[in-house]
Structure formats: structure tokens, C-alpha cells
């Protein structure tokens, strides 16, 4: 197959060598597989993620970095002064809507997810976009009620990327479907599907730069 460039660092030729004895090891944000680990105690189940996780040639793992250190339910958090990589370098913070600084807890949760990936030999992570921890394309910046977004990863996604684990968002529908089709010949991808960076909202919102200057949707 012609290897796409997304997600960065993923070895698409690996799919040609996957077997039941040597499955593709994929780490998921727990909420995408139906686990009630969202900040308000809910799940954000993504059918394509569930289908991928259930394939015989996939060994699925799941983890919620925020649940690991802050529990569930918990106050909503958001990033200030940058995205996840900026948090890891000490230039940005993560605050709850209550005003409490939980940067340390979010970083510890990200490190715990990295350790889970290491133990499980994760070759790919499928994560919840926009999340301050698991986002890969887009995360909030500033107070959530302002609905402002920035390009960049969340803290856990950035931590995994730095550890060499490629990250795919649940909104990357074209790539998810291509991945499933490569592992399941009964699956037919939707030719009209596209990844999140090709969504009209994404292209319009970030047309002027990496931080949106108008209210999001």
C-alpha cells in the first residue's frame, strides 16, 4: 500500500506483518471504548475505535490519564499559555474551572499513560481530540466558556509522541477507516470520509494561525 503521512511516525508496512500471534498493539483513550471516564462521568464512544479495538489482529489497551490522577467525575480543565508540549516544557499550565492549578496532576497522568504504553508495547494510540490530555490536533486555550481553540496536542498526547508512539485522533475518520480496512477485508471504507485537518471547520478556524481568534462552534 502507499503509506499516508498520518499519523506521524506510524509504520504502515507493519500492517503487512500483523498476525494473530503478533497483533497490532493499540492504546485507546478509555472513553472512546465506552468507559465512563469523561470529566462529567460519561463516555464518548466512537464506533470506529470500538471496531478497531475488536479486530482479531489488534491487541487493544485503554487508559484515561485524567482519571488516573484526578478521578471521575472531576472539574473540567483547560490549558493556559500554550498546548501540551508547552506544559511539558514549563511554559503553560492546566487549570480547573474552579481555578485550581492541576498541571502537576495532568503531567503525572500523562506519564502514567506513557508507562502503560511502554508496558503494552503500544505501536499506535487512538485518542480523544480537544481533550487537554488526549487531544492531538486541537485543544482549548483559556476558559472553556470562551470556546477558543488552538492547534497542538494535549499533555498526554504530547508525552506519547515524545516517547515515539504515533497518535491518531478519533476524528481522523479517513485514516481510521484505512487502518481498519487493512486489517479486516470485510470492511469497506467510506470514500467521502476525511481526517479532522481536512474538515471545513478546522480549515476555516485556523486559517489565520495556530490560535483561533474568534469564537468556536
Describe the function of each predicted region.
Residues 44-94:
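Short, surface-exposed acidic-centric catalytic microdomains
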Residues 130, 134-157:
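Short Gly/Thr/Asp-enriched flexible loops that form oxyanion-binding sites at enzyme active sites
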Residues 11-21, 47-59, 71-73, 109-124:
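Short amphipathic alpha-helices and their capping/turn segments at secondary-structure boundaries
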Residues 31, 128-131, 172:
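Short, well-ordered beta-to-alpha junction loops that form the rim of enzyme active sites
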Residues 34, 70, 132-135:
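Short, active-site-adjacent cap segments at secondary-structure transitions
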Residues 2-6, 12, 21, 85-112, ...:
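Divalent-metal-activated hydrolytic enzyme cores
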Amino acid at each position: 500500500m502507499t503509506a499516508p503521512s498520518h499519523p506521524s511516525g506510524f509504520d504502515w508496512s507493519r500492517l503487512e506483518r500483523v498476525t494473530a500471534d503478533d497483533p497490532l498493539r493499540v492504546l485507546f483513550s478509555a472513553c472512546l471504548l465506552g468507559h465512563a471516564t469523561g470529566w462529567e462521568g460519561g463516555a464518548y464512544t466512537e464506533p470506529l475505535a470500538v471496531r478497531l479495538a475488536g479486530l482479531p489482529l489488534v491487541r487493544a489497551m485503554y487508559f484515561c490519564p485524567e482519571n488516573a490522577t484526578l478521578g471521575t467525575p472531576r472539574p473540567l480543565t483547560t490549558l493556559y499559555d500554550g498546548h501540551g508540549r508547552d506544559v511539558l516544557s514549563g511554559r503553560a499550565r492546566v487549570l480547573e474551572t474552579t481555578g485550581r492549578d492541576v498541571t502537576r496532576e495532568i503531567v503525572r497522568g500523562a506519564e502514567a499513560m506513557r508507562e502503560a504504553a511502554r508496558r503494552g508495547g503500544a505501536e499506535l494510540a487512538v485518542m480523544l481530540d480537544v481533550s487537554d490530555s488526549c487531544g492531538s490536533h486541537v485543544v482549548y486555550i483559556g476558559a472553556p466558556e470562551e470556546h477558543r481553540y488552538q492547534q497542538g496536542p494535549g499533555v498526554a498526547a504530547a508525552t506519547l509522541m515524545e516517547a515515539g508512539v504515533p497518535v491518531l485522533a478519533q476524528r481522523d475518520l479517513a485514516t481510521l477507516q484505512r487502518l481498519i480496512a487493512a486489517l479486516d477485508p470485510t470492511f469497506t471504507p467510506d470514500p467521502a470520509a476525511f481526517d479532522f485537518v481536512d474538515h471545513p471547520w478546522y480549515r476555516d478556524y485556523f486559517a489565520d494561525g495556530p490560535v483561533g481568534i474568534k469564537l468556536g462552534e
